[in-house]
Design a protein with these regions (language model features):
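Glycine-biased, small-residue-rich flexible motifs in mid-sequence functional cores and linkers
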Residues: 3-211
Length: 211
C-alpha cells in the first residue's frame, strides 16, 4: 500500500480543514488507504479523546460504548494512543465500520500491522498524517497538533476522560467554540466538562443524533 499525498487543492482534501482552521497554513496530508476508499475522510466522523490517566470503570464504560459505536456503524477518528483510546481501538477494529487513524508522526515509513493491512484492503481504514517524512517519532508537540487535526476533521467529539486544566480540556473548549457537539460518559469526575457545554451520553442514541 502506497502513501498518497493530498494537497489542499485536491478534490479529496477534507473540506473541514478549510472551515475549521487550527493552523494558518493548510497542511498537506499524507494518506494510506485503498484507492477506492479515499472518500472516508469526507464521512461524518466522531473523534475519540481520552487522557492518559483514566480510572478502570471509565475504561470499561469507554470500551462498551466503542462496541456500540462499531455495531451501529459510526465512523470514528483519533490517534488511539492513550491506554483508554487503545482499548477502544481494539473494540472498534473488531467491527466492519469505517475508521480513520491519525498517528502523531509521519506515515511515510510507517509499518502496518496485519490487522491494519486487512482493514485497508477491506476499504474501511484510512491512515492520515499532516507531518513530513522528517518527523518519524511521536512527540508531545506532534500529538498536540495531531489532536487539533482530529478535532477539526470530526463532526463531533466523544471525550472519554479529561482532567481539569488538561490539554484535552483545552481542545474541548476549541471544539465548542467551533460549534461542534461534544459528548462524554456520565461520571462524577466529568462535572467540569458538563459546565463547559459537553453533553452527557448515558446510552448511544441514533447515530445521526451524535452529529
Amino acid at each position: 500500500v502506497s502513501v498518497r499525498c493530498i494537497e489542499p487543492d485536491n478534490a479529496a482534501y477534507p473540506t473541514a480543514l478549510k472551515q475549521y482552521r487550527y493552523s494558518t497554513v493548510l497542511p498537506t496530508l499524507k494518506a494510506i488507504a485503498h484507492p477506492a476508499a479515499l472518500g472516508l475522510s469526507q464521512l461524518p466522523k466522531l473523534a475519540l479523546f481520552g487522557s492518559s490517566q483514566c480510572e478502570p470503570e471509565l475504561v470499561t464504560a469507554s470500551v462498551n460504548l466503542a462496541q456500540q459505536l462499531q455495531e451501529v456503524g459510526v465512523c470514528t477518528i483519533g490517534g488511539f494512543h492513550t491506554p483508554v483510546e487503545k482499548a477502544c481501538w481494539t473494540a472498534l477494529m473488531a467491527g466492519t465500520q469505517p475508521m480513520l487513524y491519525c498517528p502523531a508522526r509521519s506515515i511515510d515509513t510507517l509499518k502496518l500491522t496485519q490487522a491494519q493491512q486487512t482493514a485497508i484492503a477491506q476499504q474501511r481504514l484510512m491512515i492520515l498524517s499532516p507531518f513530513p517524512p522528517s518527523q518519524k517519532r511521536m512527540t508531545a508537540a506532534l500529538a498536540g497538533k495531531r489532536n487539533q487535526l482530529v478535532a477539526a476533521l470530526a463532526e463531533a467529539l466523544l471525550i472519554l476522560h479529561a482532567k481539569p486544566g488538561s490539554k484535552t480540556e483545552a481542545l474541548v473548549k476549541t471544539a465548542i467554540a467551533w460549534g461542534k457537539p461534544c459528548w462524554t460518559i456520565p461520571h462524577p469526575s466529568h462535572g467540569h466538562l458538563l459546565q463547559l457545554g459537553v453533553r452527557s451520553l448515558p446510552t448511544l442514541p441514533n447515530s445521526t443524533l451524535l452529529f
